[in-house]
Amino acid sequence: MEGWQRAFVLHGRPYSETSLMLDLFTEGEGRMRVLAKGARGRRSNLKGCLQPFTPLLVRWTGRGEVKTLRSAEPVSLALPLTGSMLYSGLYVNELLSRVLEHQTNYSALFFDYLHCLQSLAGSDGSPEYALRQFELAILAHLGYGVDFLHCAGSGQPVSDTMTYRYREEKGFIASLVVDHYSFTGRQLLALANREFPDADTLRAAKRFTRIALKPYLGGKPLKSRELFRQFVIKPPSEPLP
């Protein structure tokens, strides 16, 4: 590849004695797997910068699925994520690693990702709002189109006083059943506008994104959620990502 691309490290693991195998999220090529030769060596100047949440400029070469990293430079310091914000960032990274195809352009999603990290880094409260916004952005970029404003089949506008049940690949239908797949019209209107003014609409957004993302994740649980359970003492008001 000629020229530099903006990128973030999603995940890295040791490879041989001195190298790293990295999953990158790049602006122009989407998710890339690159081998950073010698990056773990004593004299490597890459040790400090090939970390998650550090904005990078990178160059690589190669024609196979795994490229060879040629250069990497930090654009700025790593975004300061700590506590629940750090685990939320790890969740976002794992989500991208699991659902994005290799070497597919997601340039618009790249900026949604950057905005999500900036929101997490600048938040002194709950990460929930930023996470729901980003999950909905991922679904949109994956082509997961859902009409929150009209009843499937009839095409009638959603009423904020009625209850609707979600059916995968069909949408929402009016229903008297209240269960995990049921949403009020008010909650659907909030999802359509991506505005969650209260805890009720925010919880509904989380429930919907979990339902919608499940087919992309398969039956394998997210490791970041388990890490959150193990290492963070979670107050009642701080739900898992």
Swiss-Prot record:
What's the domain of life for this entry? Bacteria
Q: Which UniProt keywords apply?
A: DNA damage, DNA recombination, DNA repair
A single GO cellular-component term from the record reads:
bacterial nucleoid
| A Pfam family matched in the record | RecO_C
Name a biological process GO annotation.
Answer: DNA recombination
Q: Tell me its family.
A: Belongs to the RecO family.
PANTHER family of this UniProt entry?
Answer: DNA REPAIR PROTEIN RECO
Q: Which HAMAP family match?
A: RecO (MF_00201)
* Function (record text): Involved in DNA repair and RecF pathway recombination.
Q: What is this protein called?
A: DNA repair protein RecO
